[in-house]
């Protein structure tokens, strides 16, 4: 076990997280291209646009990260991970493409996308849950993964009902299903998983004090319990207020811990965490009023997710490149800070901030400008992460390792 309590004995192949992260960033660029296309055509399709981001970008990133974190952080070993990851990766990618196209054109090809997503996502979420539930005495981070995966599974099932409802196969209350699906996916899955991961990585990577136990131990289970209550009490608005309050407290404590870090050097990733937590707080303020401020809520939550994933990818890829090369005994392995130079991270941070400020152009109905700025930022993001992955490939090939065939 080391560093930071990581179990390196079960380190899965680097290609798993690399393919999920690269795919996620390709989808991120497709999202902004899609928004740009809609802006020039003076149209806007909310549902397909949202799902390019939530499935293509968010889910690809988080599932790829969990393939890495379950065995290393929780000791929950997934046997033959490369084959399982390939199956999930193909299903998620094809499912997202078919679903988004079907929703955009109101074509029943969306059902094919739903099929691919169901078999891949329900398979991996149930497998990961099973592996985590078998382990006793888990630390707070992997214990939180359980509740996040439970919410993810619930969100997938609710999404199935929504698609079937949309195409007339069943007749259920769409507003009720939609609100539950959104709540489970955004707060039960995404925000809870981000929080759970941060319980591990904030202290380890940024040398901060640990999170208070009342947050790290109780946040995931409390949020999950509130969401289950929401299923039976959909009109009890205080549930949304409590969920918002919990994540607001979490965000403030995250900022507080980062301000108390031992290394007081400027770091673009810490700046991204500050931006992310700021938008999480804004999202929490808007969540109880989302019916009247829905687009503001979605944008703020999207900025929270985009900022935190940028911060995590820029730390995870260099760390894993260094870790894998070091454990393989590759000579002259680069340090974490050589894999992706910090100057490039700062450049991407500034592009990201400019993109966020460009959202003000929406007020003046200049709808093409924000996706243009975000596309430039996300292309640079993809370039940097790809270069980081290629550092690993180059060093492995140079060392002529027998495991080269497992890299790509």
Swiss-Prot record:
It is found in: Cell membrane. It is a multi-pass membrane protein. It comes from Aquifex aeolicus (strain VF5). Keywords: Cell membrane, Membrane, Transmembrane, Transmembrane helix. The chain crosses the membrane at residues 15-37, 50-72, 87-104, 111-130, 145-167, 180-202, 236-258, 270-289, 304-326, 347-369, 374-393. This is Uncharacterized protein aq_917. GO terms for cellular component: plasma membrane. Its main location: membrane. The keyword Transmembrane applies.
